[in-house]
Design a protein with these regions (language model features):
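Polytopic transmembrane helical bundles with strong interfacial aromatic enrichment
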Residues: 1-49, 53-152
Length: 152
């Protein structure tokens, strides 16, 4: 199987979500850790933690969409890397913001990257070639790998 950055990042980010959850969980019983549960610092760490899961899932969904719809061309490549950049920079920005709240403009990088990736993917899905649409609507036998139902 050819290396795909979105698939790799998806599962690596999900793993990091588990690991960061474990690390945060070591300290959650301390009411005053990072300024207490409602503190800005602690909220940013929680946001970084959950972004690993959410953006890992987004990259996995992009990879699955690219496989199912056969996304190709330069816009598909830009969308792919936009999701990777957004996923990598979001938890980094959360960590920086936890300690330097005035650096909030850093969030422009992950937010714009993710919006770009989402907009390009939606555009590509809406304008998928007719030959691919015909293959995808041919019936249940069009994609044997995704089917788990037993045929009668």
């Amino acid at each position: 199987m050819k290396f795909n950055p979105n698939l790799f990042l998806a599962w690596f980010w999900i793993l990091l979500g588990f690991v960061t959850g474990m690390v945060l969980g070591l300290f959650f019983r301390d009411e005053h850790w990072l300024g207490g549960y409602g503190s800005f610092q602690r909220r940013m760490y929680r946001l970084a933690h959950i972004s690993f899961f959410g953006l890992g899932a987004v990259n996995l969904l992009f990879w699955l969409t690219a496989q199912n719809v056969s996304l190709t061309g330069p816009f598909a490549g830009v969308a792919s890397w936009a999701f990777v950049v957004g996923a990598i920079t979001m938890p980094v920005c959360c960590g920086i913001m936890a300690h330097f709240p005035k650096a909030h403009l850093l969030f422009t990088v992950p937010v714009v990257s993710l919006i770009l990736g989402g907009a390009l993917t939606l555009t590509l899905v809406l304008h998928e070639p007719q030959s691919v649409k015909a293959a995808n609507t041919a019936g249940p036998a069009a994609n044997h790998q995704l089917s788990t139902a037993n045929s009668p």
